[in-house]
Regions:
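N-terminal Rossmann NAD(P)H-binding glycine-rich loop of SDR-like oxidoreductase domains
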Residues: 3-23
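N-terminal Rossmann-fold cofactor-binding loop
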Residues: 30-34
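NAD(P)H-binding glycine-rich loop region in Rossmannoid oxidoreductase-like domains
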Residues: 35-36, 42-89, 95-98
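Conserved Rossmann-fold NAD(P)-dependent oxidoreductase catalytic core, especially the SDR/UDP-sugar
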Residues: 76-122, 130-133, 138
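Conserved beta-loop-beta element that borders a ligand/cofactor-binding pocket
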Residues: 127-149
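Glycine/proline-rich active-site loop of Rossmann-fold NAD(P)-dependent oxidoreductases
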Residues: 147-157
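A conserved pocket-lining segment of Rossmann-fold NAD(P)-dependent short-chain dehydrogenase/reductase
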Residues: 161-181
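Conserved small/polar residues in nucleotide/adenosyl-binding loops
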Residues: 191-193
Length: 193
């Protein structure tokens, strides 16, 4: 399978690129080449908002869009003339208001999440544009990722505290729930879409 992955050098996109290379897939990564590339990937070196003709005569079995934060990110990629069979957009559970019951369910109301500000709304707008424009589009709304190549010390903190037998405090008198999703589980689930 020929896969285009947006990003490819940091955390989720890097793990995904390396995962699919290890499975024998032909993996192309779209990024600005500002960080080292993973072994076995084919680099498409450019800014996703200024693609020009980088995709002339290119066809992918799958686009795995991990780095789109706004509808403009998706519009720019689609305007490039890229040809593909399926498009998977990694959105976010930030599209659900924090007042929704957790764990979040796909059929819950979406809207502003005061914790995430415009991030969730921008992801919602990107989802809507993609679904209105692309027939074979799939949206995933994962919660907090953790795992290999994590570049921020957030999600690992409670795990580290548990391993080290240290206390950590959960907001809202311990009633605030958080969902975690290992990046390896994301890659394993993608083969079933």
């Amino acid at each position: 399978m020929k896969i285009l992955i947006t990003g490819g050098t940091t955390f989720v996109s890097r793990y995904a690129a390396e995962h699919f290379v290890s499975k024998g897939e032909e993996v192309f990564v779209l990024n600005r080449n500002s960080r080292p590339q993973s072994q076995g990937v084919h680099l498409i070196n450019c800014d996703r908002l200024n693609l020009g003709n980088k995709f002339a005569n290119e066809h992918f079995d799958l686009i795995l869009d991990i780095t789109a934060y706004t509808d403009e990110h998706i519009k720019a990629l689609l305007r490039s003339g890229v040809s593909f069979d399926d498009y998977i957009f990694i959105s976010s559970s930030a599209v659900y208001p924090e007042t929704n019951p957790q764990p979040f369910a796909e059929n819950q109301t979406c809207g502003k999440n005061s914790v995430w500000g415009d991030y969730g709304i921008n992801k919602l707008n990107a989802e809507k544009y993609l679904l209105d424009t692309v027939q074979n589009a799939y949206i995933l709304r994962p919660p907090y990722f953790y795992g290999m190549y994590e570049n921020l010390y957030r999600e690992a903190f409670p795990f580290d505290c548990a391993i080290l037998d240290r206390k950590f405090y959960i907001p809202e008198n311990g009633d605030m729930k958080l969902q975690f999703f290992n990046v390896s589980d994301l890659c394993l689930s993608l083969i079933h879409i």
